[in-house]
Amino acid sequence: VGGAAAGGRRFGKGDWLRDGFGVWYKRRVRAVFFGTPEIAVPSLDALVGIADVVGVICQPDRPAGRGLELKAPPVKRRALELGLPVVQPVKVRTPDFAAWVKEREADVAVVIAYGRILPKGVLEAPRLGCMNLHASILPRYRGAAPITWAVVRGEEETGVSLMQMDEGMDTGPVFAIRCIPIGADETADELAVRVAALAAEVVREDLPRAVRGELAATAQDHAAATMAPLLEKKDGRVPWEKAAREVHDHVRGMTSWPGAFTSADGKMLKVLATKVAAAEGAGAAPGTVVAADRAGVRVACGAGEVAILRAQLEGRKALGAAELVAGRALRPGMVLGS
């Protein structure tokens, strides 16, 4: 489009704007943003830089802390700092909410980690529909917890997929995918920070191209899809019967929710950090503490051993390996998880 309209007339400085999408408009691209947790905040910041954000939708405030006081989600807090209008619908499958979204007259909705499946009426409300930033290399790890499950399953790479949303669970066609490696000892929390930055990069660089029609949306290979289901507390239980590498991946993947845990002397033990001490070999029964010194508490697995570097016994503060050994919280011969 450049600086001239059809027919050769130059766009007047006062009546046309060139927005962050690189397109000349009589107004900037209008966008609504759906997101709730911390991982979505950098994408909101990126979107504000390239479009007029005419509405921010996040989940309701939730009770948190010992006092169970209502706490606003990170996206709400950031949106209010930016002076953006925020709504927190209890239900999204209502005609009133779909009407509210439509009344924003948005060109596009940008969604990242909102936490709910949007109905057809909402998906179709913006002119170009809803575009989702999903934290995986689709079609792998569709679902609510892609970062956690990618780490737990020992993946060496993940990414962010920009997709056109449909009524399914992360099943829509994909505009672009950006990838990053996963460190061998990287936790899910650490990875989430890098994924958040990558998603913001997608917003700044790939979203504008999708809006301009420069990126074709490619259908996913549904036969190759894998799932990343919503996490439950029970998912954190350490599977000592698995190989040492898998146990280590489980611990680093389950941070910080639901947290990796086992039992010791009948009390819950949160396993906060580990390393692979021996990748192979089988000796003691899985879960048996085979050695305990300042370097770590070595625990037998189905194959090999892991060293617990940091843990927290029920009712006590988190301790490093040296403190765990000195206080005899973990001792050779103990069987964890029994």
Set out the residue ranges of the language-model regions.
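N-terminal Rossmann-like dinucleotide-binding module
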Residues: 28-67
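Internal alpha/beta domain cores that form substrate/cofactor-binding pockets in large enzymes
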Residues: 30, 54-55, 85-104, 117-133
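A residue-level signal for conserved active-site and pocket-lining positions in enzyme catalytic cores
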Residues: 35, 56, 79, 109, ...
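Donor/substrate-binding cores of folate-linked one-carbon enzymes
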Residues: 49, 108-227
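N-terminal glycine-/serine-/threonine-rich beta1-alpha1-beta2 phosphate-ribose binding loop
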Residues: 59, 63-107
